[in-house]
Structures are given as C-alpha cells and as structure tokens.
C-alpha cells in the first residue's frame, strides 16, 4: 500500500502554484488546499461590506469559511468561489495578508485541517515554513514577472475575462515587492526547500519534475 505524504508549494503570485498543486492532487488522489483562496475570501468579505482593516479584524469572529475545493468555497454558507479571481479581490488579498490577526486566523484553520491525516497538497505563501514545515516535499516555485504576467493574461482569456498585460505586470511587481518586504512572514526560500525556476518550462514539464521528487519521497517512506 502506498504511503501518503504531504506536499507544500510556495512561491510568488502567478507562477503556476495552483495549477501544479491541483494537478498533483488529482494525480495522487490527495486533498488540494489553496491557501490564497482563504485570503481572497476574507478580502471578498471586506469588499462586500466596505470595511476598514480595523473593522475587518473585529469581524473575524463572525466569519466562517468552509473550503471544499478551489471551486467550492463557502463564506458564511454562500459559495463565493466565482468571485475570487477578480483582480481587485486579488490586490486586496495581498494587502490584508500583512495583518497578523488575519494570518493567524487563516493559518489556524489550515493547520487544524492538516492535523487530521497525511495526503495533502498545500499551495500558497508560508506553506513551506509555517503551515507545513514538516511536509516531506517542499517546493519554492518561481518565474520572472513578465513570464508570470503573460501566463495570467492567457489564463484570463481562457476564462473569458478581459485583462491588460501592462496592468497585470505592474500589479505583479507591486505584489512581489509587498510580499518580499512585509514584516510578517516575508516571501522567501526557507532552509531545506527545493527552489525551481520554471521560466522555460511548461506546466507538464514542471509537473513531471515535481512528481519525480514526490515519488522519491514516497519511496523513502
């Protein structure tokens, strides 16, 4: 019987973390956790009620997130998944991710979930060093900002969502700066994490490289 492990994938926005993590989870029949969608859910709540950051923190006690998968995310019993890819929500999610109370709120939900069993693919910032530091496979996936912007434009076009390359590139650069320089858990390659730069790799090539590392880890169990 194959033994399950945990896999954590970290990295900047738009690098393909979600796509790769979902593909791995499907292939291995694991549970996929996209941590960024938790922040987007909180950002959606903030935007919906036009809250300041201080009021948002006070409202956390009234927020219940039920994460089924990336296509079903319930916020106080409302499925909000279709709204979470909006660029405005994405920008606000990055802003509120610097708030310690919000990070702790979301982190605890995820940590409690992963205590139950092995067999998770968790994707998002902080995953490799805070949420899943003991994961058997920890990856930091990276790519240049122009490459990531072009990928985002392509992704949006496939979803029939209009987008502007220059605006997306500017947003990515601003988000990178914010994520790498924030006081709370800045984006970085943690000790023992395998860094993979996939500028010149497509999704399938990136998937196969990481799957090879996963199979090696499973064989060692």
UniProtKB/Swiss-Prot annotation:
Could you say which enzyme class this protein belongs to?
transferase
Record's superkingdom?
Bacteria
The cellular component terms of Gene Ontology attached to this UniProt record, alphabetical and capped at eight, are: cytoplasm
Gene3D superfamilies registered for this protein in UniProt: P-loop containing nucleotide triphosphate hydrolases (3.40.50.300)
SUPFAM superfamilies associated with the record: P-loop containing nucleoside triphosphate hydrolases (SSF52540)
Q: Does the keyword Nucleotide-binding apply?
A: yes
Protein's GO biological process: pyrimidine nucleotide metabolic process
Family in the record: Belongs to the cytidylate kinase family. Type 1 subfamily.
* The protein, known as: Cytidylate kinase
Give the species: Mycoplasmopsis pulmonis (strain UAB CTIP) (Mycoplasma pulmonis)
């Amino acid at each position: 019987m194959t033994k399950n492990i945990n896999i954590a994938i970290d990295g900047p926005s738009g690098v393909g973390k979600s796509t790769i993590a979902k593909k791995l989870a499907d292939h291995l029949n694991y549970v996929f956790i996209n941590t960024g969608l938790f922040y987007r859910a909180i950002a959606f709540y903030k935007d919906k009620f036009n809250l300041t950051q201080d009021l948002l923190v006070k409202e956390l006690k009234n927020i219940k997130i039920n994460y089924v998968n990336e296509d079903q995310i319930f916020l106080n019993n409302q499925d909000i998944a279709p709204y979470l890819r909006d660029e405005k929500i994405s920008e606000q999610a990055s802003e509120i991710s610097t708030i310690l109370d919000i990070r702790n709120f979301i982190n605890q939900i995820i940590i409690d979930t992963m205590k139950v069993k092995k067999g998770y693919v968790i994707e998002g910032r902080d995953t490799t060093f805070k949420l899943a530091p003991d994961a058997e496979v920890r990856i930091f996936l990276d790519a240049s900002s122009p490459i990531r912007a072009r990928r985002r434009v392509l992704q949006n076009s496939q979803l029939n969502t209009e987008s502007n390359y220059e605006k997306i590139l500017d947003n990515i650069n601003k988000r990178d700066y914010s994520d790498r320089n924030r006081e709370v858990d800045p984006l970085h390659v943690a000790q023992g994490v395998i860094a993979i730069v996939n500028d010149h790799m497509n999704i399938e090539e990136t998937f196969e490289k990481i799957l090879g590392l996963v199979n090696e880890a499973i064989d060692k169990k």
